[in-house]
Swiss-Prot record:
Residues 119-128 have a biased composition (Gly residues). Signal peptide: none annotated. It comes from Paracoccidioides lutzii (strain ATCC MYA-826 / Pb01) (Paracoccidioides brasiliensis). One of its GO terms (biological process) is iron-sulfur cluster assembly. Keywords: 2Fe-2S, 4Fe-4S, Cytoplasm, Iron, Iron-sulfur, Metal-binding, Mitochondrion. This is Fe-S cluster assembly protein DRE2. Residues 268-284 are annotated as: Fe-S binding site A. [2Fe-2S] cluster binds at C268, C279, C282, C284. It is found in: Cytoplasm; Mitochondrion intermembrane space. Residues 108-118 have a biased composition (Low complexity).
Length: 366
């Protein structure tokens, strides 16, 4: 019997996922739809799900069936069911819903002879003695990662976590002193000269153990630490501050040390054609030397800029005496209609290229 001729098993709401190749064979698709009740069965195309054109409702279906393609294999189905599509299919299943890889057949039943995608294992989806195809095994792994589990029948099912109930933890009541961890309220200690220690008095008896009665006001399970027993050494208060003498590191250096030249390491010495950068924690003087050079260069640059500054009474002359010499845009001599926005000749009449034009204190002289 072909997979499309397998009768439907169980009841509930079904979702049929069809590969696009099956739509070109309407007789096969209609035969599959005829095996299920139309009012409780939905049909979706896998390629539309993969492209995100349609979405599946949440927690709606009891059984999702992956239909075989036109060649009666699951090769096309496995190729279209990506991780995102499979996660959407799992979300559309109700708790306890089933995912079956053929037309209402459980995992491991039937065969895919055309593509070699799986073989009968006799025991369902848990894996049998015969070798499964890599595509089917990869699909099973993705299904498990998506949240499905194999039930006792070998079917991929969505676990029902709603049946679980929270169990409160009841803490026991306070035990009486007689039922505490100390038993009858005494602790057996090694004997010391046959002395039994009790709550009221100390008596000498020929016993070999010492019994100490626990104070009845002490809660069960509470231990006390005696900090006073330090073998005669007094305890130091935490608030007591130790006097620490601060040492100025500059006082450790004398005049001879301050006048001693700094020995520059060989790796820090400048090399020809390359300026070495100073270390972050430089102590050889290279950092100070480079900073001094930078300051000198900066001062020289500022001094050079000062000499180039022009005052308001200085003459700013643009010489066009060279025949054919024009501005960078080439339109300065053509008039305002052809001049740039920041052209110094805006407002001036057109002049011939080569004509001397002088701007002197905002007075135009041609």
């Amino acid at each position: 019997m072909l997979p499309s001729q397998t009768p439907a098993q169980g009841s509930g709401r079904f979702l049929l996922l069809s590969p696009p190749s099956l739509s070109s064979h309407p007789e096969k698709l209609n035969a599959i739809l005829g095996l299920h009740a139309r009012e409780s069965t939905d049909l979706q195309m896998l390629d539309r799900l993969a492209l995100g054109l349609v979405s599946l409702p949440q927690s709606t279906y009891d059984v999702v069936l992956l239909l075989t393609g036109a060649d009666n294999t699951l090769a096309e189905t496995y190729r279209l069911v990506s991780r995102g599509v499979l996660q959407g299919v799992v979300n559309s299943l109700k708790p306890g819903g089933k995912l079956r890889n053929r037309d209402n057949q459980i995992w491991g039943s039937g065969s895919d002879s055309a593509a070699g995608l799986g073989s009968s294992d006799g025991g369902g989806g848990g894996g049998g003695g015969e070798k499964k195809s890599s595509s089917e095994q990869a699909f099973r792994n993705e299904a498990i990662l998506a949240g499905l589990v194999f039930d006792d029948r070998g079917e991929l099912a969505k676990p029902d976590f709603g049946a679980q109930q929270a169990v409160p933890l009841k803490l026991g009541r306070k035990k009486n002193l007689g039922d505490s961890a100390f038993g009858n309220g005494t602790v057996e200690l090694p004997a010391s000269n046959g002395v039994r220690v009790t709550a009221g008095a100390t008596t000498t008896t020929p016993t070999t153990t010492t019994t100490t009665t626990i104070n009845s006001s002490t809660p069960s399970g509470v231990r006390f630490i005696d900090f006073s027993d330090d073998f005669g050494v007094p305890m130091v208060e935490e608030t007591q501050e130790l006097d620490e003498e601060l040492i100025d590191e500059e006082e450790l250096l004398g005049e001879f040390d301050m006048g001693r030249p700094i020995v520059q390491p060989p790796e820090c010495r400048p090399k020809a054609g390359k300026r070495r950068r100073a270390c972050k924690d430089c102590t050889c003087g290279l950092s100070q030397k480079l900073e001094a050079e930078d300051r000198a260069k900066r001062a020289n640059a500022d001094k050079a800029l000062e000499t180039l500054k022009l005052g308001t009474n200085d003459l700013a002359e643009v010489d066009f005496t060279v025949q054919g010499k024009v501005g960078s845009c080439g339109n300065c001599a053509l008039g305002d209609a052809f001049r740039c926005d920041g052209c110094p000749y805006i407002g001036l009449p057109a002049f011939k290229p080569g004509e001397e034009v002088r701007l002197l204190n905002n007075d135009v002289q041609l």
